[in-house]
């Protein structure tokens, strides 16, 4: 099945559904890394330096603000991968931001909610990009007026409506991991480590899963080691193939940038599983 991409009045490209999916997934993977790397590099440094000057507390809050915009960054990168023009790209980003749930509506205004739900961002991107593709340039001069509503606000609103159901996935995983903590310690650590290893490079937020389960002690250590196991599988797999920047990013724990490769080559799950079992 092919999807036709329009720019102006000219057809510029035909994409398969598969390439459409991976273009969005690549945008998500890179966007997550861009949003999180400043915090990974400087977050703990600023916390330490905040003892000596309040300016570092302020700078640390800027890192948090930057990560809250992850869905916007993801939307822009996905739009670029899909060869959208500038207005289409920012409309896609706006839809992703609304659908992410990064902002909650409260009686007192808006409340920041971290990066939001990445699974829901993915669903919202598919809906918004599909609408933008379908409309193309069919609306002519009305595009600039109607496309933000049809391709941005409405898909974002749909994303908000399905957000509670997306969170059920995280909740179910959290409940499963909570059940693992009731098992024999050896079996528990193996199951938790392998689960975290296999899920690290998916749109599922392990931070959200950890919040649901409130892991501590041996279980928390197994989860952390599972994450380390996944990072090192990708790190050593990248040696000699990727550039220094990619290898450095993997070394500091940004394995989510390999999300598209993980889905494109599911065989990667085998070394991840083995490493997770051994380290568990």
Give a label for each model feature.
Residues 6-280:
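Pore-lining transmembrane helices
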């Amino acid at each position: 099945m092919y999807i036709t991409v329009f720019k102006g009045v000219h057809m510029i490209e035909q994409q398969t559904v598969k390439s459409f999916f991976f273009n969005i997934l690549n945008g998500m993977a890179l966007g997550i890394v861009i949003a999180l790397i400043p915090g990974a590099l400087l977050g703990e440094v600023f916390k330490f330096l905040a003892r000596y000057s309040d300016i570092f507390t302020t700078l640390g809050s800027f890192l948090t603000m930057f990560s809250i915009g992850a869905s916007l960054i993801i939307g822009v990168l996905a739009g670029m991968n899909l060869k959208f023009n500038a207005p289409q790209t920012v409309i896609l980003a706006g839809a992703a931001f609304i659908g992410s749930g990064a902002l909650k509506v409260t009686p007192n205004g808006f409340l920041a909610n971290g990066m939001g739900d990445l699974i829901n961002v993915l669903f919202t991107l598919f809906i918004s990009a599909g609408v933008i593709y379908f409309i193309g340039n069919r609306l002519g001069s009305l595009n600039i007026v109607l496309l933000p509503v049809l391709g941005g606000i409405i898909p974002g609103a749909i994303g908000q409506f399905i957000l509670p159901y997306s969170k059920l996935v995280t909740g179910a995983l959290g409940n499963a991991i909570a059940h693992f903590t009731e098992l024999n310690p050896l079996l528990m650590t193996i199951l938790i480590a392998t689960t975290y290893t296999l899920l690290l490079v998916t749109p599922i937020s392990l931070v959200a899963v950890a919040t649901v389960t409130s892991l501590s002690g041996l279980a928390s250590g197994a989860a952390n080691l599972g994450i380390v196991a996944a990072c090192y599988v990708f790190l050593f797999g990248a040696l000699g193939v990727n550039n220094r920047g990619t290898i450095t990013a993997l070394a500091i724990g940004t394995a989510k940038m390999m999300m598209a490769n993980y889905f494109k080559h599911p065989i990667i799950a085998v070394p991840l599983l083995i490493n997770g079992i051994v380290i568990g």
